[in-house]
Amino acid sequence: GYNNVEIPTTLKSSLTTKGEVDYSQKLQNLISEQLVGCGFNEILNNSLTAASYYEGSETYKNENLVYLMNPLSNDLNVMRQTLLFGGLESIQHNANRKNADLKFFEFGNCYFYNAEKKNPEKVLAAYAEEYHLGLWVTGKRVSNSWAHPDENSSVYELKAYVLNIFTRLGLNFGNVVFGNLTNDIYSTAISVHTRGGKLLATFGIISKKIQKAFDIDNEVYYAEINWKELMKAIKSAKVNFKELSKFPAVKRDLALLIDKNIQFAEIEKIAYETEKKLLKEVELFDVYEGKNLEPGKKSYAVSFLLQDESATLNDKQIDKIMSKLIANLENKLGAKLR
């Protein structure tokens, strides 16, 4: 009976505590809140997808797909290499229900297989998993009303969202390289790499071929950020506080005649390399292509904001900086003043 049950002389117990959210998770929550504040909705798609999406793709090759041994169907027979197609399925689903003005974001894993890394002793050596953030923008940015007309979304709107994420996380733009990207996913796109060559992000306009395959009428603007690489890039970022300058900033404008293949990012890079201390901002405010220009040329109107934190800049200092800047743009890009 119960009278014969042994009662231990010591009582053992354990306490559990809630584990701390890691740094990456905190920043993910921060960016999620930021995107929701910008009108985005978070989506969560299946990591399983259709191998047919990757057929003939040079960017996401069939040979890098992770196949399931016993798939439920051909629509769920591989692990995704990109978040893109899941988001396009969500856009298609909404557009078919007359909801075409959309902004989505998703955090999720992408999976890759590399046969060259295959090792009999390490079964998982050939497989890789990356954590990504995807952004989708399509349809109207502003709907028609008495206060304003319709305004469509654009790739520049998407670019602003991507750069705002980088800025919020404290990424040093001096340590990254922006470049043109040409592949079968985008019709026009930009890539963002670290100085060490690691890919941080791509963003641009989805190709008409893919858009048509999903039966989507409006252009789709898409960005994919490698979250893990971004976390590495901002690891050394520090938040610095300083008082507002007591001395006025000075703006100077240049009208530059350049080759059509030259991008604003190249001008911006040369400008910051030329004057690292006093140059605060470089902005492109006008682009002209057409009559009265040489064939193969375009005109960029660029403004440069200069400011000294400790004194008022005089004309001699400003002219010296601008002369040096003009010389570097001419030598490196063949730019001419109009």
Q: What spans do the regions from the language model cover?
A:
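A carboxyl-terminal module marker
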Residues: 3-7, 26, 45, 121, ...
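Metal-dependent nuclease catalytic core centered on acidic motifs
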Residues: 102, 111-115
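Short, flexible loop/turn elements at secondary-structure junctions
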Residues: 72, 108-111, 196, 286
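Short, structured patches in soluble enzyme cores that scaffold and shape functional sites
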Residues: 9, 70-72, 109, 137-139, ...
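Extended, well-folded interaction surfaces typified by the phenylalanyl-tRNA synthetase beta subunit core
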Residues: 1-102, 252, 305-310, 316-338
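Long, charge-dense accessory insertions within large macromolecular proteins
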Residues: 88-93, 113-114, 209
